[in-house]
Amino acid sequence: MPLLTTGKSFIRALEKSGALGVYVPLEGGFEGRYQRRLRANGYTPYNLTARGLGDLSSYLTGIHGVRPPHLGKKNIGQDAAVGPVYFVPPIATYQLETLPPKSKGLVLWIIEGMILSRAEIEYLTYLPQQEPRLKIVVEMGGERYFRWQPLEQSIQAA
C-alpha cells in the first residue's frame, strides 16, 4: 500500500458499480482518508451504522413510523399501550433533496455491514440503479489493507 493514495481508482470503481463492499484495517483511519477523497471529488458522504436499521427500504427511501421508548410514562386511555408513533422522513431521500447544487451525489457509508442479511445487501446493491445520484459503501469486514470490490461480488463471497 503506498503511503499516499489519491483514491482515484476507488472513486472510479464506486462510480462504475454504484455500490462497493470495503474491507478495512481494524485499527481504523483508512476509511476517513477515503471519505476525504470522496468529499474532495464532489460527493457528500453520510455515515451510519447497520445496527438497528430495521427495514432498509423504509428507513432509507420511505416515511416510516418510530415508537420511542416510553421510559415508564404512559398516557392511560389516550394512546396505544405501546406508545405514540412518530413519523420520520427517509434518510437517503431527505439527504438527496438537500444536497448542494454542485454536488455529484450522496455516498452512504455504512459501517458494521457484516451483520446485514443477504437480502438487505442485495437491496443495497440495486438501490443506486433506482437513484443514480446515490452511491453505497458498506464495510463488510476487516483486512490487513484497505481493499474494495463491487457489492455483488461481496454477496457471492458470503
From Swiss-Prot:
Molecular functions per Gene Ontology: oxidoreductase activity, acting on NAD(P)H, quinone or similar compound as acceptor; quinone binding
Record's subcellular location: Cellular thylakoid membrane
Domain of life: Bacteria
Membrane topology type: Peripheral membrane protein
Listed EC numbers: 7.1.1.-
A GO term from the CC aspect: plasma membrane-derived thylakoid membrane
Disulfide bonds: none
Top-level class of the enzyme under EC nomenclature: translocase
Reactions catalysed, as given in the entry: a plastoquinone + NADH + (n+1) H(+)(in) = a plastoquinol + NAD(+) + n H(+)(out); a plastoquinone + NADPH + (n+1) H(+)(in) = a plastoquinol + NADP(+) + n H(+)(out)
Keywords of the record: Membrane, NAD, NADP, Plastoquinone, Quinone, Thylakoid, Translocase, Transport
Subunit structure: NDH-1 can be composed of about 15 different subunits; different subcomplexes with different compositions have been identified which probably have different functions.
Function field: NDH-1 shuttles electrons from an unknown electron donor, via FMN and iron-sulfur (Fe-S) centers, to quinones in the respiratory and/or the photosynthetic chain. The immediate electron acceptor for the enzyme in this species is believed to be plastoquinone. Couples the redox reaction to proton translocation, and thus conserves the redox energy in a proton gradient. Cyanobacterial NDH-1 also plays a role in inorganic carbon-concentration.
Protein name (record): NAD(P)H-quinone oxidoreductase subunit N
Source organism (scientific name): Gloeothece citriformis (strain PCC 7424)
Record lineage: Bacteria, Bacillati, Cyanobacteriota, Cyanophyceae, Oscillatoriophycideae
